[in-house]
Amino acid sequence: MRRHSSKSGVALPPVGQGPDACQMLTRAQLGQDPPQRTVLGVLTENEQYRRACGQEIATIRCFSGSENVFPAAGKKVLPDNGVSEPAKHGFDIYMDDPEQGDRDSCPGREGIVFEDVYEVDTSMLKSDLHFLLDFNTVSPMLVDSTAHAQSEEATDFGSDVINVTEYAEEIHRYLREAEVRHRPKAHYMRKQPDITEGMRAILVDWLVEVGEEYKLRTETLYLAVNFLDRFLSCMSVLRGKLQLVGTAAILLASKYEEIYPPDVDEFVYITDDTYTKRQLLRMEHLLLKVLAFDLTVPTTNQFLLQYLRRQGVCIRTENLAKYVAELSLLEADPFLKYLPSLVAAAAYCLANYIVNRHFWPETLAAFTGYSLNEIVPCLSELHKACLSIPHRPQQAIREKYKASKYLHVSLMEPPVVLPLQ
């Protein structure tokens, strides 16, 4: 991994080869203080958002190419139909041995050579693909401690289409059916040859930082992590390209969810130019193909907002529930084995107990069909995550919810023992 010369940055040394190559360095080994957060690049403000809010639109030009930026003078755009470019060596994708029950979770079809970002036959992907990438570029995991951004996220149930009162039960029923179809494999990390749970946690921690810097919605973060996990459930990725996959995931999620998504060039910049714009766009294209362009997925955040609307609580409990739910993103194991609706219910229960000394109201039990006994296993895991987060090196979520706009809920100490028996 590349070093960075910024005074405010912390760079991980190059990754070695051999049996210890998959081990992650902690901040203690690097001589860092625990409160500092891990970021994979230097971040900037969302200039596009300010331009769009502060200026009138003067001219609209039509062109083929990136939807975020106008093409530079003389730069090639997408070729016309029927005109192909010479084949170039790109990403090789190989077929894995199929497993029982895996066909529904990976929508691809056959092994292909991903030769050009614009020329791909979408009928050729197959389930259980392995993505074998060159290990010639390593992601720089850098910290920019000067970046202090606040999320614009504010609960506005009145404009949330998921919480339309007249159709709340039908919407919830549909989301419960959809979450089963779009869940990642619970233990996919066991089949990843070159990445670990710790590497994924560092990446998710960085995605939280990116979301805060560019003032992205919380739902954008949840979508990005969902895209990442579904992709890794089907593809084996070398660690040198893991950040590229994560960057493409949040780029795609921001295009889907945000009104003013950051430019592609911004996402290239936050990786410290480790990857080129072309590489990022190619990875975005591959991500779409592996996900079969299925981007509308239920998340824990959506279910939690439904529960908060159905059974209102004080603003402190609401913010604490959001904080607890977001902690579940850091760990693929054990939380991927629980459905998002169940994780949201556990987050609601834990926050409600910490603040109000009550767990699961009868109204939500009737609305969701979940009893407290069904929620207890996930609730126990979330409780452990809350107790351990002050001692973890990944502090982005905790720092985010230390802000006054969230009433400093991440500083609240949960009880050591929950009366669950």
UniProtKB/Swiss-Prot annotation:
Which gene underlies this protein? Ccna1
Q: Does the keyword Nucleus apply?
A: yes
Give the family, as the similarity comment puts it: Belongs to the cyclin family. Cyclin AB subfamily.
What GO molecular function annotations does the UniProt record carry, in alphabetical order? cyclin-dependent protein serine/threonine kinase regulator activity; protein kinase binding
Question: What organism, scientifically named, is this protein from?
Answer: Rattus norvegicus
Its biological purpose is as follows: May be involved in the control of the cell cycle at the G1/S (start) and G2/M (mitosis) transitions. May primarily function in the control of the germline meiotic cell cycle and additionally in the control of mitotic cell cycle in some somatic cells.
Sorted alphabetically, the keyword list is: Cell cycle, Cell division, Cyclin, Mitosis, Nucleus, Ubl conjugation
UniProt-recorded name of the protein: Cyclin-A1
Q: Where in the cell is it found?
A: Nucleus
